């Protein structure tokens, strides 16, 4: 009896193996429609893959977006830095061009003045509270600079030295509000007219040339230069041009309003006119200066 059941189990096992092999073979055959168990398994697996794939794809895309955004930001920062560097370079080039032009024109001044030793200098400071009054330059007594020396730019006279240190000096501008600031000048024409630069209108930005003869006619655009009568400034340094002329209240003299040739607002490179040994100031010069009341 036990032998029978043993054989029966063996037979069932063999039949099961045969059926399983048949099912496997059947499932491996090419056919258009899958059985419902196969389709069920495929649907479950596909649904699971879809659930996993979408978040994974979203996260991957988000990470890629963040990386791209960071790269774009970094690139923009580099471009911005380059633009700033180019802007700075352009500004430096413009400053160098202007400086080169000023220095070339300063050399032209050097060639045009014979009895004076021109000394080129740079403006190192300017007080905003008295912008029209003074500037500081980088040349002083150790360079031979002395008070009352004329200071010019390529465009014309700007003022005179008032005080000196060893390595710097103070220049009082023609536009100074100091009533004692005077320069002897003349209006060029068929007949020269002499007067004194004394005063500045900050509203019109015009110098005042006073004590001109009441009976002389003047035209807009006539040139005004230093007269040299003060004995300290060389004659012929350009100051500016006439804009208009007014007669004083008493009718005894005229005042011409002069547009400065030099840009008094923007001063960078200047020239100090040092008196040479042959053209030094004498007692006669000092007397002349006191008589005319100007430089």
Curated annotation (Swiss-Prot):
Keywords for the protein's UniProt record, in alphabetical order: Cell shape, Coiled coil, Signal
Keyword Lipid metabolism: no
Coiled coil location: 66-112
Pfam families, per the entry: MreC (PF04085)
Cleavable signal peptide: 1-34
Listed GO CC annotations: plasma membrane
Disordered as annotated region, ranges: 276-295
Keyword Coiled coil: yes
Protein's GO biological process: regulation of cell shape
Family annotation (InterPro entries): Cell/Rod_1, Cell/Rod_MreC_2, MreC, MreC_beta-barrel_core
Family per similarity comment: Belongs to the MreC family.
Job of this protein: Involved in formation and maintenance of cell shape.
Oligomeric and partner information: Homooligomer of 24 subunits, arranged as 12 dimers.
PANTHER family according to UniProt: CELL SHAPE-DETERMINING PROTEIN MREC
Protein name: Cell shape-determining protein MreC
Primary gene name: mreC
């Amino acid at each position: 009896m036990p032998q029978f059941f043993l054989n029966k189990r063996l037979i069932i096992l063999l039949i099961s193996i045969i059926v399983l092999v048949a099912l496997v073979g059947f499932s491996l055959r090419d056919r258009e429609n899958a059985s419902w168990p196969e389709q069920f398994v495929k649907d479950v697996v596909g649904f699971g893959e879809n659930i996993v794939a979408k978040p994974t794809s979203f996260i991957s895309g988000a990470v890629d977006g963040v990386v791209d955004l960071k790269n774009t930001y970094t690139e923009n920062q580099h471009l911005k830095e380059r633009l700033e560097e180019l802007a700075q370079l352009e500004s430096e080039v413009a400053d160098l061009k202007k400086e080169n032009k000023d220095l070339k024109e300063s050399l032209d001044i050097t060639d045009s003045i014979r009895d004076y030793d021109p000394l080129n200098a740079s403006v190192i400071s300017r007080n905003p509270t008295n912008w029209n009054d003074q500037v500081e330059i980088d040349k002083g007594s150790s360079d031979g600079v002395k008070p009352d020396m004329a200071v010019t730019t390529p465009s014309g006279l700007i003022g005179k030295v008032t005080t000196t240190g060893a390595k710097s000096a103070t220049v009082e501008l023609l536009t100074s509000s100091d009533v004692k600031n005077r320069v002897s000048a003349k209006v060029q024409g068929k007949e020269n007219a002499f007067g004194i630069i004394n005063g500045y209108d900050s509203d019109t930005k015009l110098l005042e040339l006073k004590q001109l003869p009441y009976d002389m006619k003047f035209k807009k655009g006539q040139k005004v230069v230093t007269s040299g009568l003060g004995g300290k400034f060389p004659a012929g340094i350009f100051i500016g041009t006439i804009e208009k002329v007014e007669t004083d209240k008493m009718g005894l003299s005229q005042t011409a309003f002069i547009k400065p040739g030099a840009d008094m607002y923007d001063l960078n490179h200047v020239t100090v006119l040092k008196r040479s040994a042959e053209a030094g100031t004498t007692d006669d010069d000092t007397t002349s200066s006191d008589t005319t009341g100007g430089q």
